[in-house]
């Protein structure tokens, strides 16, 4: 699944339904595009996972932990005026990852961003953050994580 925001709409793309036997190569169609409204995407992922009916899930999220969108956050409560969807307000919105945990879908953050955004990753995803220093570490790191999570599910 990937997401991006374009012209005020967040587009979710499902590359493969895990009930199908084909489509493994669709992930290679991924292209980075648009803005990233992480809070909305995380709420959508939570909804999709809860309705899937699967009992055991592994949710890995590759992110730079820098949510940003050109559509502003509306004013609410004591905040009368709209705000940019960036910085602290966007990170607070993206902290919807806690709802995923509450619903039995704990996300594991694969952080590929700048060192300065690591604190945002921890605010959004809690202690389940793994730092990927470079793309070269991706396969080895993710392989070990998946192996560890699968072993934990078996016990």
Roles of regions detected by a PLM:
Residues 1-155:
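Acidic, glycine-rich A-domain
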């Amino acid at each position: 699944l990937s997401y991006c925001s374009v012209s005020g709409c967040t587009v979710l793309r499902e590359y493969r339904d895990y009930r199908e036997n084909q489509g493994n190569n669709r992930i290679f169609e991924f292209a980075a595009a648009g803005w990233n409204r992480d809070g909305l995407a995380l709420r959508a992922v939570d909804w999709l996972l809860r309705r899937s009916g699967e009992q055991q899930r592994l949710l890995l999220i590759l992110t730079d932990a820098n949510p940003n969108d050109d559509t502003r956050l509306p004013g609410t409560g004591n905040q009368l005026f709209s705000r940019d969807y960036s910085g602290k307000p966007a990170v607070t919105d993206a902290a919807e990852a806690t709802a995923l945990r509450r619903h039995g879908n704990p996300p594991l953050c694969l952080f590929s961003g700048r060192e300065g955004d690591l604190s945002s990753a921890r605010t959004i995803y809690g202690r389940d953050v793994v730092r990927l220093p470079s793309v070269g570490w991706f396969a080895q790191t993710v392989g070990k994580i998946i192996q560890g999570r699968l072993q934990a599910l078996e016990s």
